Amino acid sequence: MGQKVHPIGFRLGVIRSWDSKWYEEKNYAKWLHEDIKLREFVKEKLGQAGISRIEIERAANKVKINVHTARPGIVIGKRGAGIETIKKDLQGLTDNEVYLNVVEVRKAETDAQLVAENIATQLERRIAFRRAMKKSVQTALKFGAKGIRVACSGRLGGSEMARYEWYREGRVPLHTLRADIDYGFAEAKTTYGKIGCKVWIMRGEVLPQSAGARAPRTTGGARP
């Protein structure tokens, strides 16, 4: 039976970069747990802002946090008051100096994490799961996605037995490394229990960065 590889982890170093960009030998475990705490705090504090991903860069006792959000206005607040409050709270979680940067997500409809969270929110509001899934598929294709797959698992519609349902439109080639596939996961906390929502979105094809930098191979022949 075939198993699913995480689409983003599978493409790291080929067409995708890491969300944590730093190198450390002695304090690796400390920094890793610190990154987890920073991400969890931002997600909890800015739950309504539509957070797609959080990038963390470290260099010379400085931590730069890039928050990719669909609603930058909620993060920044009136005259930048919101961002200063969050920055102050984040400073208490780390010994290093914190720099907070807000990056706007232009097309939230083709961002897998935001689509998954949107479906989860609709399920919590008791909207029919088939309707929520089909609407997300149609919207993503309308905004330029080449293909999309949406899957929900759990006690769908309040049924006694948990099941797995999915819809797919267009191309979603999970084994093609040059395929720019975005993946997102969210959980809907309903009265019947948790429902998992997974989304795969194919946004096009990207040539691997290493392919362009690689020197052309020469065949053996007479010496010049």
From Swiss-Prot:
Q: Which residues form the KH type-2 domain?
A: 38-106
Keyword field contains Secreted: no
- Gene Ontology MF terms: mRNA binding; rRNA binding; structural constituent of ribosome
Biological process (GO), any one: translation
Q: Does the keyword GTP-binding apply?
A: no
UniProt similarity note: Belongs to the universal ribosomal protein uS3 family.
Q: Function of this protein?
A: Binds the lower part of the 30S subunit head. Binds mRNA in the 70S ribosome, positioning it for translation.
- Subunit structure and binding partners: Part of the 30S ribosomal subunit. Forms a tight complex with proteins S10 and S14.
Under the heading HAMAP family, the entry gives: Ribosomal_uS3_B
Q: What is this protein called?
A: Small ribosomal subunit protein uS3
- Name its species: Anaeromyxobacter dehalogenans (strain 2CP-C)
Source gene?
rpsC
